[in-house]
Amino acid sequence: DRNETITMAMESTTKIMTCILVLENAKVDETVSVSAYAATMPKVKLYVKCGEHYTVRELLFSLMLESHNDTAVVLGEYIGGKLLGETGEISEHTGEESKAALHRFAQAMNEKAEEIGCEDTWFITPNGLDATETLTLSDGSTLEREHHTTAKDLAEILRYCMKTSPQRDLFLEITGTQDYSFTENGRFFQCHNHNAFLPVSYT
């Protein structure tokens, strides 16, 4: 189908890749702190606050059931920081440090996309909010890239998450959960599954 290779904005389907990368790079019982930058994300969000702590599991349910933009950034920043060799609290990040960690996470997203066979996909953010970036090529020229994918590549990503990834069972457990609630930082949170973008036929 010709439409399979037309580029399109990813929006919330970005969070599928964010989820699987987090599962492959962290344990769900690890505790993550919130940076000032992550707390500024627009709706839809969990309303995390700078300095709060959550488990990776809690954040993943928030991410995949409610598609929260702030939790995507908390998780992306955490994994990006780990990949950069950071050992300190994410909550202590300056704005520039947050962006550097998120840039490293986006690199990991693009590396994974290439690894699983995506042909026309480019990640810039962990939450799918529209973004562009300017890349400097080896010859000194520049290239404008947008956050995008195709239907064909998205199918490859879903297939990997549900069938091939070593963390597929956890991915399916999270995305197949209808309701999840938790209490952290003196607040009660309830997440309901709105995941229309995960077709049953892939499971």
Regions found by a protein language model. Give the residues of each.
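Penicillin-recognizing serine hydrolase domain
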Residues: L59, E77-Y202
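Substrate-binding clefts and substrate-entry loops adjacent to catalytic sites
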Residues: N25, A39-Y47, D70-G88, G95
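Active-site SXXK
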Residues: A9-S33, L154
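Signal peptide-directed extracytoplasmic domains
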Residues: A39-F61, L65
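Envelope-exposed proteins and targeting segments
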Residues: I6, V28-E30, P42-V44, I116-E119, ...
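A mature extracytoplasmic/lumenal domain signature
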Residues: T14, A36-A38, C50-E52, S67, ...
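Short, well-structured active-site flanking segments
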Residues: E24-A38, P166-G176
